[in-house]
Amino acid sequence: MFTRIMVPVDLAHLEPLDRALRCAADLAKHYGAVIVYVGVGAATPGSVAHNPQEFAQKMSEFAEAQAEVHGVSTEGVAMTSPDPTTDLDPTLLKAVDQVGADLVVMASHIPNLTDYFWPSNGGTIAAKAKISVMVVR
């Protein structure tokens, strides 16, 4: 049913992603799918990496570690954006097509007052993606 599961990750904030990571791994095992972890970073130095090449290396290392932990096939893809905070949703939607995903599994957040003014990333991806999206809270 699914062959390529895209999982957006923020390497600077992995703890809140735990349930989504485990869910994606379970689905990948069930369907024999590959998990493609996608991270979006800036071209400028940040808390995770000093440059896009280092960020790509860290994404690959993260994917390899997840493959070992969960026993699934993985890939790590680093996307670069001039402003990841404001450009995250469009960049992730481009990644869906770029990696050939047929399912997105992503973490949600606890809803709060700001959701009335700014939509959540998961909600935006679910509304605009042409493939199935599972938002895990």
Task: Describe each PLM feature range.
Residues 7-8, 37-39, 74-77, 104-108, ...:
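Short beta-strands and strand-loop turn motifs
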Residues 26, 95-137:
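Gly/Ser-rich helix-loop-strand patches that form or flank binding pockets
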Residues 20-22, 53-56, 89-92, 118-122:
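Charged helix-capping and loop-helix junction motifs
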Residues 29, 68, 127:
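Anion (oxyanion) recognition and catalysis
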Residues 17, 56, 85, 114-115:
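A conditional alpha-helix N-cap/helix-loop micro-motif detector
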Residues 2-50, 72-73:
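Small/aliphatic-rich secondary-structure junction motif
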Residues 49, 57-73:
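Helix-adjacent hinge/juxtasegments
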Residues 69-104, 111-112:
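Structural beta-alpha unit
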